[in-house]
Amino acid sequence: MKNLGFGMMRLPVLSGPTDFDYAQLNRMVDAFLDAGYTYFDTSFVYHNGKSEEATRKALVERHPRESFTVATKFPTFMLIPEEKIEETFQRQLDNLGVDYIDYYLLHNIQNVYYDGYDGKGGIVKTTHLFDHAKKWKEEGKIRHLGISFHSSAKLLDRVLTEHPEIEFVQIALNPIDWDSELVQAGPCYEVIRRHGRKVVIMEAVKGGGLAKLPENAEAVLKAVHPDWSIASWSVRFCLEKEDVIAVLSGMSTPEQVLDNTKTANSAEPLTDEEKKALAEAMRLYRESAPIPQSEIERYKGLVYHGVPVSAILQAWSICQIQPDPGFSDDNNYLKNAIAEAEHVDFRKGLEKQTVVTADGTDITELVEKAVAWLTAHSF
């Protein structure tokens, strides 16, 4: 199965985020389709709300409807009142220029929007969002209903239990997030499969963060496969996962399209030697962060407002070595972890808690710094 997906969130532009370079984008879309791939993923909010329109112009208006599948998402986090939900969905159909959407997702389902800060029900429940989506499916306006998810495996298990209508879940998954304490990509993936649902993988190269590694980490990978791009290791890691509809890549250049389609066309399950090399490269990557993973291990067992301190520091530290630290997927998880643990709204401030290690070292200031940064950059 050809399961590479084109993420329409980092499209080529000429000046600003909505001034698309259609000459280049059209070539990229054509090359992707020519390689045998059909899944295009957009959203109501990408590129300042213009990604769906760009998808229409570069894809829908230029290719037969049966030659591609399109996915887009309802902007849960915009807190749209229920009386505006139907209007918003119709705008998405119009933006895309289609009569139906192949894969429709409720965007960014997480603790705050699902349960609310108080645990009594977030925007998803108060606006009956799933009921609207089920109606659209019954009307034939969407073919498959799913969610994108940014929270704990525990919450995901409950959401899938409470909503059997969910057919697939989109999660951040890559070699770093797989065993991230906060992102929990591995546990979330296993929850989805245990429920018999399908998976869409986003952030396969962690927003470009795994396309270039520290020199010593790259050397480990190049020693095994000198001809593989660094990014392709992460893509291969994702492509070998089972029950996956699409592995998304937010591509910006024709070269990235060529590299990703070439990788997907030739991808085989990683060998034991390749897995060992990738694991070592990721270890070196974590060690290059401001707080090396070996140091973070010292903080296991410590908790700050119900969240493991090691998870907080790991997420903050990894964000700092991303190409765009303020837009890393890790940023979106802390507020949900705190809300899930204590039903506290981090936006109103957190009560003072002291964090002291077993040897008596006070690391409260370090933890507060990490929490403040992750809070400021949450979305």
Model-derived features: positions:
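N-terminal binding-site loop/beta-alpha segment at the start of enzyme catalytic domains
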Residues: 1-68, 132, 363-379
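Glycine/proline-rich, positively charged
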Residues: 12, 20-23, 30, 79-183, ...
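Structured C-terminal cap/extension of enzyme domains
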Residues: 33, 37-38, 187-379
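Short catalytic-loop micro-motif centered on adjacent basic/acidic residues
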Residues: 39-46, 143-147, 246-248
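Hydrophobic residues in well-ordered beta-strands that form the structural core
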Residues: 41-42, 72, 201
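Short beta->alpha linker loops
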Residues: 46, 50, 150-151, 252
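Short, electropositive alpha-helical surface patch
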Residues: 54-67, 157-169, 259-267
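Structural motif corresponding to the early beta-alpha repeats
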Residues: 62-82, 107-110
